[in-house]
Structures are given as C-alpha cells and as structure tokens.
Amino acid sequence: MQVDIGAILTGYAQGYFLMADEETGSLAWYGTEQHALIPLDERFHCPRSLRPLVRGSCFQVRINGAFEQVVEGCAARPQTWISSELKQIYLALHQAGFAHSFETWQGDTLAGGILGIALGAAFIGESMFYRIPNASKVALVKLVEHLRERGFRLFDAQLMNPHLARFGAFLMDGRDYQELLQQCLRIPCRFD
C-alpha cells in the first residue's frame, strides 16, 4: 500500500484524525467540535493513588522501542477503529519520523504504551493500551513530563472520557483549537 504522507499530515494539521469503521474497516477522516486536551501546565493532575508508581521503579520508559507492538496493543480490542490499513499508515508515519510510541516496560515485558503523532509543538495522542495494570496511566504522566521538557505546547487527546478527565483533561472548542494548533505547527520540537 502506498501512503501519501503529505496528505495524511495535512489532515492532522487541519485538526482531523483517521479512524476505520469498526464493522467495515473503511478508513475516513473525522473531526470534532471540541477537542480533549491534556494540559501541559500546572492544570495537569496526577491522581494521588498513581504517584508512588510514577516515582518508583516499577515501570521503565522507552521511546519508539517497540512501535509496531504498541500499534498492535492499541488495536487489540474486540471492536477496534485501528484497521490493518491504518496500521500501515502509522508505520509509514513512524518511518518518516512523525508517529511515535511512548512505552512503559517491566523488565523485558512491554507493559503499556501510547501511540501518537508529533507535528511541530503539537502531540496528537491516537490511542493507548496496557497489559499490566496502571502501565498506560504511568505512561501518560511520564509522557506529559517528556512533552514539557521538549517544549511541546499541545497534547491533543481528541475525545474526552472519564479516564482523561482524572488527569485534568479539558475541552477546547474548534476555533480556539485551530488557532493553537496553527501556532504549534510553526514551532519546531523534537519528540525523541
């Protein structure tokens, strides 16, 4: 399959995201009137119960250590929007330096991870998974720390859910989001 990286990046740069229909597998662009953002400032909240795991040595963090395994982990659900075509797109974006995996490990075991796309100072979180309890939560906290250190200004989680709300996620309307995204696209940041 030939992937038009430029066209894919243009879609993300306009605030859209790709999803496959769970039943047919057909791929389409989706937009939302409000984007769920993970704050990269003092509004970010690490739940108290998670703090010992974040400070401890239970999980080690790696970047892009097992990208394909993270994609597979994110897709391994009874119903998934990550089709085989979308997996190929993520792999092409990864090979081009845009898609990344942020992983938690226990020894030699991949415990969990987050899949996302970095464009300028924006990180667009596509999906996350865990195999060991709390691994994806620790990955989220450590990813926020990493994005702060690298100068990122936007962490787009796309759609709100109660899990993200526990970390301080908030909704931003489309117009404000577009303005922030366009600013971030002009700021060079290196993810890895």
Curated annotation (Swiss-Prot):
<keyword id="KW-0808">Transferase</keyword>
<dbReference type="GO" id="GO:0030163">
    <property type="term" value="P:protein catabolic process"/>
</dbReference>
<protein>
    <recommendedName>
        <fullName>Leucyl/phenylalanyl-tRNA--protein transferase</fullName>
        <ecNumber>2.3.2.6</ecNumber>
    </recommendedName>
</protein>
<keyword id="KW-0012">Acyltransferase</keyword>
<comment type="function">
    <text>Functions in the N-end rule pathway of protein degradation where it conjugates Leu, Phe and, less efficiently, Met from aminoacyl-tRNAs to the N-termini of proteins containing an N-terminal arginine or lysine.</text>
</comment>
<dbReference type="GO" id="GO:0008914">
    <property type="term" value="F:leucyl-tRNA--protein transferase activity"/>
</dbReference>
<dbReference type="GO" id="GO:0005737">
    <property type="term" value="C:cytoplasm"/>
</dbReference>
<comment type="similarity">
    <text>Belongs to the L/F-transferase family.</text>
</comment>
<dbReference type="InterPro" id="IPR016181">
    <property type="entry name" value="Acyl_CoA_acyltransferase"/>
</dbReference>
<dbReference type="Pfam" id="PF03588">
    <property type="entry name" value="Leu_Phe_trans"/>
</dbReference>
<dbReference type="InterPro" id="IPR004616">
    <property type="entry name" value="Leu/Phe-tRNA_Trfase"/>
</dbReference>
<keyword id="KW-0963">Cytoplasm</keyword>
<dbReference type="InterPro" id="IPR042203">
    <property type="entry name" value="Leu/Phe-tRNA_Trfase_C"/>
</dbReference>
